[in-house]
């Protein structure tokens, strides 16, 4: 048995194929999906989706938040943005992660606008997801 996984962003279909297993970054923690999983809808956090293909290899997709629906061995993930780990440049992702960390550290050392800090934390989470997806 297998699952049909679709990862859809507003501007493109990022992934559409059969897989053996999916691990989703839900807002309440990592969620493993295998064939026969109960139907559900869950919020997706910024993070890395991991999928195991029929050949046993694991691949990663960086997700930028959204929702996932599981129904009858179909997993549909609707996200704000997504990127296949194998299409991300490792050096660029690591550089962006370090820059986002530095920007957040600078803001946390200052008193001031919490909206700027929230944006910096979100940027850091997105950069971390991209960096982790390429490294997996």
Curated annotation (Swiss-Prot):
Molecular function in Gene Ontology: ATP binding; proton-transporting ATP synthase activity, rotational mechanism
Family matches, as Pfam families: ATP-synt_DE, ATP-synt_DE_N
Supply one GO CC term from the record.
Answer: proton-transporting ATP synthase complex
- Which stretches does UniProt call biased (Basic and acidic residues)? 116-125
Task: Report keywords, A-Z.
Answer: ATP synthesis, CF(1), Hydrogen ion transport, Ion transport, Membrane, Thylakoid, Transport
Subcellular localization: Cellular thylakoid membrane
Q: Where is this region: Disordered?
A: 112-136
Q: Subunit structure, per the record?
A: F-type ATPases have 2 components, CF(1) - the catalytic core - and CF(0) - the membrane proton channel. CF(1) has five subunits: alpha(3), beta(3), gamma(1), delta(1), epsilon(1). CF(0) has three main subunits: a, b and c.
Question: What is its biological role?
Answer: Produces ATP from ADP in the presence of a proton gradient across the membrane.
PANTHER family documented for this protein: ATP SYNTHASE DELTA/EPSILON CHAIN (PTHR13822), ATP SYNTHASE EPSILON CHAIN, CHLOROPLASTIC (PTHR13822:SF10)
This protein is called ATP synthase epsilon chain
Q: What gene is this protein a product of?
A: atpC
């Amino acid at each position: 048995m297998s699952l049909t996984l679709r990862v859809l962003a507003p501007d493109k279909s990022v992934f559409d194929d059969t897989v053996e297993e999916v691990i989703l970054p839900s807002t309440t923690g990592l969620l493993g999906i295998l064939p026969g999983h109960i139907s559900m809808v869950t919020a997706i956090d910024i993070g890395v989706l991991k999928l195991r293909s029929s050949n046993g290899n694991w691949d990663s997709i960086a997700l930028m938040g959204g929702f996932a629906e599981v129904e009858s061995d179909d997993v549909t993930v609707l996200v704000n943005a997504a990127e296949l780990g194998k299409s991300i440049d490792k050096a660029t992702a690591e550089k962006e992660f370090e820059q986002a960390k530095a920007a957040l550290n600078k803001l946390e050392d200052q008193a001031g606008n919490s909206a700027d800090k929230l944006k910096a934390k979100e940027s850091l989470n997105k950069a971390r997801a991209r960096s982790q997806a390429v490294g997996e």
